Curated annotation (Swiss-Prot):
It catalyses: a hydroperoxide + [thioredoxin]-dithiol = an alcohol + [thioredoxin]-disulfide + H2O. It comes from Coxiella burnetii (strain RSA 493 / Nine Mile phase I). This is Putative peroxiredoxin bcp. Belongs to the peroxiredoxin family. BCP/PrxQ subfamily. One of its GO terms (molecular function) is thioredoxin peroxidase activity. Disulfide bonds join 45-50. One of its GO terms (biological process) is cell redox homeostasis. The gene is bcp. Keywords: Antioxidant, Disulfide bond, Oxidoreductase, Peroxidase, Redox-active center. It holds the Pfam family AhpC-TSA. Thiol-specific peroxidase that catalyzes the reduction of hydrogen peroxide and organic hydroperoxides to water and alcohols, respectively. Plays a role in cell protection against oxidative stress by detoxifying peroxides and as sensor of hydrogen peroxide-mediated signaling events. Its EC number is 1.11.1.24. InterPro entries: AhpC/TSA (IPR000866), Peroxiredoxin_AhpC-typ (IPR024706), Peroxiredoxin_BCP/PrxQ (IPR050924), Thioredoxin-like_sf (IPR036249), Thioredoxin_domain (IPR013766).
Length: 151
């Protein structure tokens, strides 16, 4: 299932990097940048997270919420967040339920080994909970600027 512009964003509840539960439904009335990434503390994922960190003051002043989602554990998210001073929330989707809902789980092949993994994807969700932009197969360079430009 892939999510397209104009669709209602699938509602989910996941544990945050602080171990609390967060529901997308709780963020109605705010713009949300929801970005899915493969793994904490890897080169591309770190660069993407630090990109959002570096424009955080601009985003927070505009009332925009940034949420990062991966399969990493709450503990891994805590370490990643602390190591890179990330000011936004990271969510743990250990069983890939939300990744599947949003259609970001894809077949991958690394060194001949086939597996299911997260395809780096960003969704912009408007104040009504509707998808207003989608960036599939994200290339990290220039991505954050492109997202900010759509706000």
């Amino acid at each position: 299932m892939s999510i397209e512009v104009g669709q209602k964003a699938p509602i989910f509840t996941l544990p945050t990097d602080e171990g609390e539960m967060l529901s997308l439904d709780d963020l109605k009335g705010k713009k949300v940048i929801l970005y899915f990434y493969p793994k904490d503390d890897t080169p591309g994922c770190t660069k993407e997270a630090c990109g959002f960190r570096d424009v955080w003051s601009q985003l927070s002043k505009a009332g925009v919420v940034v949420l990062g989602i991966s399969k990493d554990s709450v503990k891994a998210h805590q370490s990643f967040k602390q190591k890179y001073n990330l000011p936004f929330t990271l969510l743990s989707d250990k069983d890939n339920t939300v990744c599947e809902q949003y259609g970001v789980m894809v077949d991958k092949n690394r060194f001949g080994k086939k597996y299911k993994g997260i395809e780096r994807t960003t969704f912009l969700i408007d104040e009504e909970g509707v998808i207003s932009a989608v960036w599939p197969k994200v290339k990290v360079d220039g991505h954050v600027a492109e997202v900010v430009g759509r706000l």
